[in-house]
């Protein structure tokens, strides 16, 4: 009898965990879709509305750390200028208890990073934290060498 009760409790808790995970995916997908739509609008003022005033936004591959919305706005404006046709596509995302992760694809034409005029596409991931409905911490991870090879700065493998 005790083992049946334990099994029922385990199944119920597992179901609650799956429901919470699915709810997190829906919330994560919604936030990321909106934030990426802002990036895709190429409007830095729109981009920063999805981030807290004290956000720490880190582009790990490029070595850029931006503290606060003003620095993030400057970074976004520079990136949009360098890749004027940038496109971010959410592959998958999940937010749970204020922590999130998203897989994405970034594509565009290099007009200012290395000024080659060549197109690139790279998969990446963001690890982020949410506070008060805004992103308060974001770390982007991707393979910069992939971009460099695609735009001709590094030799193809």
Residue ranges and their predicted role:
Residues 35, 47-48, 55, 68, ...:
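Hydrophobic pocket/interface hotspot
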Residues 51, 106-108, 126, 142:
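Short beta-strand segments enriched in hydrophobic/aromatic residues
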Residues 29-30, 44-97:
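A solvent-exposed, acidic/Ser-Thr-rich amphipathic alpha-helical stretch
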Residues 81-82, 108-119:
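Short, cysteine-centered beta-strand-loop-beta hairpins and adjacent loop/turn segments enriched
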């Amino acid at each position: 009898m005790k083992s049946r009760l334990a099994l029922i409790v385990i199944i119920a808790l597992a179901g609650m965990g799956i429901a919470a995970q699915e709810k997190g995916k829906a919330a994560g997908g919604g936030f990321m879709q909106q934030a990426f739509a802002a990036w895709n609008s190429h409007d830095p003022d729109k981009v920063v509305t999805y981030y807290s005033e004290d956000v720490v936004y880190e582009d790990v591959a490029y070595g850029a750390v931006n503290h606060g919305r003003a620095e993030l706005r400057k970074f976004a404006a520079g990136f949009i200028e360098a890749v004027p046709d940038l496109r971010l596509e959410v592959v998958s995302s999940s937010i749970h208890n204020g922590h999130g992760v998203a897989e994405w694809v970034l594509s565009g034409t290099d007009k200012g990073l290395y000024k080659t005029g060549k197109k690139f596409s790279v998969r990446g991931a963001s690890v982020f934290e949410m506070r008060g409905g805004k992103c308060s911490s974001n770390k982007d991870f991707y393979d910069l060498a992939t971009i460099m090879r695609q735009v001709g700065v590094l030799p193809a493998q």
